[in-house]
Amino acid sequence: MSTAHVLTTTRRGALGLGAGLTALGGALAVAGPVLAAPTATASTRLDTGVGLGSGAVGTQSVVLDQPAVRQASLDAVRALRRRMWGKNPPLLSLDGASGGTVQSYAAQEGYATVDAYADAVVWDQDLERIAVQRLAECIDMGKIQHSRPNGEASSTATIGDIATGTYEILAMTSDTSAGITTGIDMWAGEYDQLVAEGGAWSHATGHLHTLLNPSVTHYGFAASSGYSVGQGLWSRGGSADSTGWSGTYDITLAGGTDEAPAASVQTDRPAPSGSGSSSGFQHIIRSFWR
């Protein structure tokens, strides 16, 4: 039995975004609001602290285990970077003006060894909060896309000094038991295409590029019900601790539906058969420029 899954990525204004947020990050490092992590035994209402945007406010029930997601995702991304250091595929900056290979690009960013490159990956609680918010919104919509249930762009999911957008990567599989490592494996599946495109960021390489880009070091991930969400940014101030959210939560969102469709029957278009994947997965890859 094959498992359908979907990928989508966005480069938030790519070149213009980079200059704007780098300047902001260099001038001011402000962590997002600190919210107590409730202990959920039954369903607990949760406000992530992320801006909801316009529209009527409702909730979406989501089962979270963010401490486990934090550890698993950090381990997986660091391990991925170590593997890619050894393979040393081409990797360019977003504008193509710098880079070369994983190792040479990492060295340009100040990471001269595999340990330095892999260990540069750190958790960012503000990005985690955005990831959890976007997870709830994707589950509510029954699909992954870089917009929100109220129709606004995902870049409106802001918190603290993260006010312009992030590098957002999304994945969805009909295997609702799949965790964040499945999502990371799906994103890493773009290796051959990254090589074919000479290391450039594109619609078909953006997920893996976001995980390997040595200028992107801060990440937050969330996963539930077959959905995986990643948020990335360059080095910034903020807490490296998990929110600690673990249990069933009714997460607030704007413009949501009364009942979320099942992920197993939701794709953006029919999944092509015979993808050739050794895992038996069928692939749909979608990417967006913002």
For each feature predicted by the language model, list its residue ranges.
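N-terminal secretory signal peptides
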Residues: 1-9, 17-37
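Aromatic-acidic/polar surface patches that form glycan- and anion
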Residues: 7, 66, 70, 200
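Composition-driven, intrinsically disordered low-complexity tracts enriched in small residues
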Residues: 36-56, 60, 245-290
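Residues marking the start of alpha-helices
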Residues: 3-5, 117-119, 199
